[in-house]
Structures are given as structure tokens and as C-alpha cells.
């Protein structure tokens, strides 16, 4: 039976957990604010990790500043990660803003608006369909 997840996948999951804890407890820079680690992509040789993060900020400038702060602190974060994990080589890390949540919400709003507009064109009340389903 083949392994469902390779070593790189398992290490990436562990890195995600460790980085989340480090960002929560150790990184005190106010420019970072509330940050969530949404995913980690790790090369097969475990040398480089791309850390996808989301912020509870809406301003593009604040998000860019947060990513820059994280990338500037990546050496310190890497040292802390190396102490927490038992790896022969601790991967180089790079932080990237994860746009999937924002894009998903935007697409969801587009679909909702399109359905509502379609119902209004047909003369139906958008709330009427909700009542019919109950």
C-alpha cells in the first residue's frame, strides 16, 4: 500500500503548526497583527518552504507591510522553528500573502448578487425562494 502523504507533506504540516505557534507567541511586531498560517508548500528536498499567511487587515498597504515584516524576521523565525523541530536541515522560509480566502469571498458575493439579480428579473422576491425551501 502506497503512502498517502510523503515526507515533505508531513513536514509541511508540522511546519505549519510550529510557525503558527511562533507567530502567535514570539513575533510581537504590531505591524503583523493577527496572522493565520493557511498553508505551507515545501520542496521535495526540504530546503525551501513557502508559508502562506492571511491577515485580519483589509488595507493593501498594511498587508504588504505585514508580509515584509515577516520576511525580515524569517531568520529569527527559522531559528525558533529549528529549535522546536527535529530536522537535519531547517528549510529557508519565505512568507507569501494567501489571496484565496479573499478571492473566494469575492466569487461567493458575485454568485449571490447574480442569483439575486436573476430572481428580481423574473419577478421573484429573493426571500420568497428561501421560504419555499423550508
Curated annotation (Swiss-Prot):
Entry keyword Cytoplasm: yes
GO biological process, one term: maturation of SSU-rRNA
Subcellular location: Cytoplasm
A Pfam family per the record: RBFA
Keyword Cytoplasm applies: yes
Chief place of localization: cytoplasm
GO cellular component: cytosol
InterPro entries: KH_dom-like_a/b, RbfA, RbfA_dom_sf, Ribosome-bd_factorA_CS
Family the UniProt entry places it in: Belongs to the RbfA family.
Protein name: Ribosome-binding factor A
Organism this protein belongs to: Tolumonas auensis (strain DSM 9187 / NBRC 110442 / TA 4)
Amino acid at each position: 500500500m502506497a503512502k498517502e502523504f510523503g515526507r515533505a507533506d508531513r513536514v509541511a504540516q508540522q511546519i505549519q503548526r510550529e510557525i503558527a505557534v511562533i507567530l502567535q507567541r514570539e513575533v510581537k511586531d504590531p505591524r503583523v497583527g493577527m496572522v493565520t498560517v493557511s498553508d505551507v508548500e515545501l520542496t521535495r528536498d526540504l530546503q525551501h518552504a513557502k508559508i502562506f499567511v492571511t491577515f485580519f487587515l483589509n488595507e493593501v498597504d498594511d498587508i504588504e507591510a505585514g508580509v515584509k515584516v515577516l520576511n525580515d524576521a524569517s531568520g529569527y523565525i527559522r531559528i525558533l522553528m529549528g529549535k522546536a523541530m527535529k530536522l537535519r536541515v531547517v528549510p529557508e522560509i519565505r512568507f507569501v500573502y494567501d489571496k484565496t480566502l479573499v478571492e473566494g469571498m469575492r466569487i461567493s458575493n458575485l454568485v449571490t448578487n447574480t442569483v439575486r439579480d436573476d430572481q428580481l428579473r423574473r419577478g421573484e422576491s429573493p426571500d420568497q425562494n428561501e421560504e419555499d425551501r423550508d
